Each structure stands twice: as structure tokens, then as C-alpha cells.
Amino acid sequence: MLTKELVKEAREKAIRMLEKACIAITDEEKEKIEVTDFGLGVLYTFGLEILVYVNNERYCAKELVMFPRQICPEHRHPPIGSYLGKQETFRCRWGEVYLYVPGTPTPNPRARIPEEKKRYFTVWHEIVLRPGEQYTIPPNTLHWFQAGDEGAIVSEFSSQSIDEKDIFTDPNVKRIPEIV
């Protein structure tokens, strides 16, 4: 559960990171930055700061701001009716991000997962993204990612985003945050 104070703190930190990366955003966009702890109550371990520029039935563009070593838990974007599920391209803008997808598990991956949560991380093929590098994730594909030691900023370009329908491996995850 997030407090209003923690959301404000995280939003301000995300804004500073965007400024450091020379990514200009408007005052209105600063207020729209979403902060989620995925309902796990440990924002700086499991969390994400998200600025949605546009999201409609045809396409979506976002900035994903990640604090040092922050993790977005394993999930997939399933088909919904005639919609195939979200296809997304992650492009690293700043920092370093470790993305995990199905494939041959990477020996000695860079990610660090709390021991009590490891059972909820099942794909271990590592893709390291540095500024200027990108990777496209097909619809309905399990994936998760973690920022490097300095954090990361990732631009996401995708088909329509319906975050509330994402399916997480960890049954304790709540994608839409509860703020008190």
C-alpha cells in the first residue's frame, strides 16, 4: 500500500531522473506520473514510475522510470477478445535495464531477486539494454525487468496498453496501486 507522501517522494525522484537524462516533460505530465508498488508494499524493491504520453486503441507511448535495482514483476499482456495482447518495444534511454524473457536461461544473471519471491520469476533469458538499445516483446509473452545499480529510464512503444488486465506470476501483485 502506498501513502500519498511516498507517491509524492517517488514522483519527485522520477522527475529528477528524467531531468538528469535530459528528457523534457511538461508540468502537467509531471503531475500525471503514476507510481506503483504492485501492491507489494516495497516500492524501492518492486515498483515502477510511469508517464503515459498517449494510450489509445491503436498505440501507446510511455516512459518507465526505475530506481536503482527496482523490479517490475514477471507478467504478460494476454489476448482480450479480438485483441492479441500488447506488443511492446523497450528502448533504454538512460542507465541500464536487465530484461528477462523466455529462452535459454542466462548463467549468472545480473538481476537480484529477494529470495522469498524467486519462485515467481520463471523466465531467465537475459537481455541487457543500455542507452540506445531496444528489444521488442511479442504479445502474451512472460517477461520482467530490473534496473541496474543507477536506475534506468526506458521508453515503451506499444500497441494499446490495458494494464489492469496484465497477468502476473505472483498472485499477490496488484497492478493498480492502492494509495492511502
UniProtKB/Swiss-Prot annotation:
Homodimer; disulfide-linked. Stabilized by a disulfide bond between the two monomers of the dimeric enzyme and increased hydrophobicity at the dimer interface. Optimum temperature is higher than 95 degrees Celsius. Retains 60% of its activity after 60 minutes incubation at 80 degrees Celsius. SUPFAM superfamilies: RmlC-like cupins. Belongs to the D-lyxose ketol-isomerase family. InterPro entries: RmlC-like_jellyroll, RmlC_Cupin_sf. Its EC number is 5.3.1.15. This is D-lyxose ketol-isomerase. D-fructose binds at K62, K86, E156, D166, R175. It comes from the Archaea. Coiled coil: none annotated. Keywords: Carbohydrate metabolism, Disulfide bond, Isomerase, Manganese, Metal-binding. Mn(2+) binds at H75, H77, E88, H143. The keyword Manganese applies. CDD domains: cupin_YdaE. Shows highest activity with Mn(2+). The Mn(2+) ions can be effectively replaced by Co(2+) ions. Shows less activity with other divalent metal ions such as Fe(2+), Ca(2+) and Mg(2+). The keyword Transcription regulation does not apply.
